[in-house]
């Protein structure tokens, strides 16, 4: 696809297999086309590697963080489980939402929590709401520790952001989906992988070996979940869909 943006005429010109067309800026399709290109360019220049949340690096798109906040506010979980810790920014993000609500704990799981990251997380003022568990998120013994940390929480929200291979994410979906309460969400991050094949820091098999492919297989075998983004709590826009690193990654448990 070839895209040309004419700011004087306020149009986006698109040339693809179906021909050429000019889309006015006022058409939601123009926003969709430009957003997809922006996501790809952002990947190439590592746009998400420049944000922090309350002092800790958080490698997420700002829009994705806002949508997570909306979902947590709406579902009011007693416990939030995140696989993939890295610098701990997302853990602190979730813990800050719990702190504002005056309710909830956060459990972070990673196969390796580097000492400097652990020290920074443990020194953070929100650490009392966080439990760190080091181990393979798909190992039975690790999952048991997570389940113990969640305890008797009635409302549980799960965010999967560790190893992004299809098989690993599928195993996580099967395991951690059992923790999610009815009405809450199971989120598989980084399904954008299939859209950035050929970009820097990618692998040739990402078109099939990615979290989105795991979600498809999981939904085919599991009828307690549906693919469904949280409802917009406020939306006076003409925008269709989301500008996200995990399109199609929101799963709501319906029973």
Residue ranges and their predicted role:
Residues 10, 51-255:
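S-adenosylmethionine/decaboxylated-SAM
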Residues 16-19, 23, 43, 154-157, ...:
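Membrane-proximal envelope and lipid/glycan-remodeling enzymes
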